[in-house]
Amino acid sequence: MEHEVVSALAAFTQRYVACWQQEKGHLPASEALYGIPSPCIVENHEDTVYWSPQPFAPSVALDGVERALEISLHPDVHAFYTAQYAGDMAAQFDSLSCQLLQVWSEEDFTRMQENLIGHLLTQKRLKLTPTLFLATTDSEMTMVSLCNVSGEIVLEAFGTKKRQHLAPTLAAFLSGLNPLAV
């Protein structure tokens, strides 16, 4: 399953980069990431960074999250967050617009692990089934997440039991994403 996630993420990332090149005439660009070091940076121009995905550091894993919470994380989330360095990627899944979260650098990986720990602690306190966020949405109160128990992808309302099924697996979700050059 991990291999399917890595392949599906690589395929979506290729579609995303191609979308940018076709619609904008250049690699993906971000003003928000300007000035933040990353192995992804190809060029800085004015207040914009142009980036290309890069292989992830092979020895890094989400072990810190597992140790902090004494929980085993679903293998798909390990594969998702440790496959590549990249900027966040805008996408559409059916009628849902989202920003697929990615790791920009080793420092960003540490921050992301801390955020996952905070998210899981909140869920534990509220006695909710554990999920791991994968993408933000236009609403600050919803996010796309992987259910740590079943591996299915859900749209969840933060801090509630309200969850809408999106896809049976992370690989299926990634394969169903359409890239947006925004």
From Swiss-Prot:
Which CDD domains would you find in this protein's record? Syd
Membrane topology term: Peripheral membrane protein
Primary localisation category = membrane
Question: Which subcellular locations apply to this protein?
Answer: Cell inner membrane
Claim: Membrane is one of the keywords in the record: yes
Spell out the GO cellular component terms annotated for this protein, sorted alphabetically and separated by semicolons: cytoplasmic side of plasma membrane
Keywords from UniProt, A to Z, are:
Cell inner membrane, Cell membrane, Membrane
Q: To which protein family does this belong?
A: Belongs to the Syd family.
Q: What does this protein do?
A: Interacts with the SecY protein in vivo. May bind preferentially to an uncomplexed state of SecY, thus functioning either as a chelating agent for excess SecY in the cell or as a regulatory factor that negatively controls the translocase function.
Q: What is this protein called?
A: Protein Syd
Protein species of origin: Pectobacterium atrosepticum (strain SCRI 1043 / ATCC BAA-672) (Erwinia carotovora subsp. atroseptica)
